[in-house]
Amino acid sequence: MWLALLQGIRLAFWPLYAGWIALSLYLAVYLPIFISMARSLHRSWHVPLPMAAATAWVGCELIRAYFVTGFAACMLAHSQIPWPWMLPVASYFGSYGISFMVMFMGAVLCQWIRWGISKRSDKSNARSNKFIVANTLHTLFAVIAVCISIWSLHSNDSWLESQAPIKPLGTILLIQEDMPTQFDGSPEDMILGWQRYEQLTAFAADINASKQIDLVVWPESTFSAGVPWFDSENTPTPADLELMAVTESDMQMWLSQLEVKLNRIQSAFPNKATRYLLGTDTVKLRPGKVGKLNTALWFDPENRAMCGYYAKQHLVMFGEYIPLASSFPALLRLIGMGTMEAGEKPVAWQLASGATLSTSICFEDVLPHLIQSHVSKLTAMGKSPDMLVNITNDGWFRGSSILDHHLNNAILAAVENRRPMLVAANLGISAWIDGNGRVVRSLPRMQAGWILAEPIPDGRWGLWQSIGDWPARFLALFSCLPFVFALFRRFVVRA
């Protein structure tokens, strides 16, 4: 199953065939672990089967969301994306809450089916009556939970209708091109890709000339075209430049090219109130050290001193870094891969309209706890984001199902944090998602286009925003306790 779900990984780069198989085998291990956990809770601790199954499943999902670098795509909750009446659960307990309810209801249904098949051969009426009472209570719990979720969804719709018209947070232009991405792409290919993005941006600006565009968003790594942004505390010294294997004239040429590119994009929008969020590589220069970052560059023409960037915090293993890579530099050169540094903190920016946004890059929105952490930290700093923006370059995956998995995570991130989510994706799927998880507008995969999004504020509070995944952590701990006690009895008590 996992090989089929994740087959798009292999399309990015030939060494990732091994990564695709390894990741699939790793994820497959969780099924027998889940069965063992649920069985132990049910038989050893006498936890009712629906509760045992749901607890064990959520425990496994939480563990794989954190273990090593974390992988929280293709969760059971994502199967409910087509049915928005289940999604409000995520605003209280995250995607783990939806997974819990789906597994709980599935186990209740299996219990009824098993009872229906076996009741003819079961001569114990007392046992049968006890089962009926217990499973009826479980069914009632599931029905009440679903009704509350549906009520939450419809009550918010009613509130929005009563408040209409609601002033949008801003007018945001999301750009999507159909440029495939490859590790061994030539400089000419990168320049061509940049030119296509520039032309599409200018065309979209011309079509929407009557609109005041507050923000233009380019996907991950599409602005670089082989020329990175530079972050230097002071003027780079010759020693610093030597670490980069470049000369001072090279540096001046790159800086000049960056200035030209920014001016060319800005020329399509004569109003200086327009801001720009551009996916680019950044070279971070520090005395005696050079680091490469995957960043979202913020460009404010009215105040260039406020230009800055958000550096991706959660790097993709084998794509952006390789464990212990510094010990094998020759291997990195052989397969044509480098390694990046991780960012340190979330960043918030403000539009001319006054709205604040927070950015994530690539598969960062696959980790529910990371986005929740961004929102929580920024709120504590007095910079609570009104909307979330994800920039990603999914051109690696050639239109495969990986794009659908990625969009599903963005949808749940919007619901969990009760904020609209905007996705700008190279090759797709770019989308405008509201705080209920509804896709207001999206672009087809592998097609060029743009979305003119006007997201509305969603000021609702959700339990997830305050406590994050602590309920899921408790379930994970509880599901592991039978193993802990079994090991304790085996090795400690016997000794």
Language model feature labels by segment:
Residues 1-159, 391, 398-400, 426, ...:
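Membrane-embedded alpha-helical bundles of multi-pass enzymes
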Residues 34, 38, 201-205, 346:
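Generic structural signal for well-ordered alpha-helices
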Residues 27, 54-55, 197, 206, ...:
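CN hydrolase (nitrilase-like) catalytic-core segments centered on the catalytic cysteine
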Residues 141-208, 395-406, 411-418, 422-423, ...:
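Non-cytosolic juxtamembrane linkers/loops
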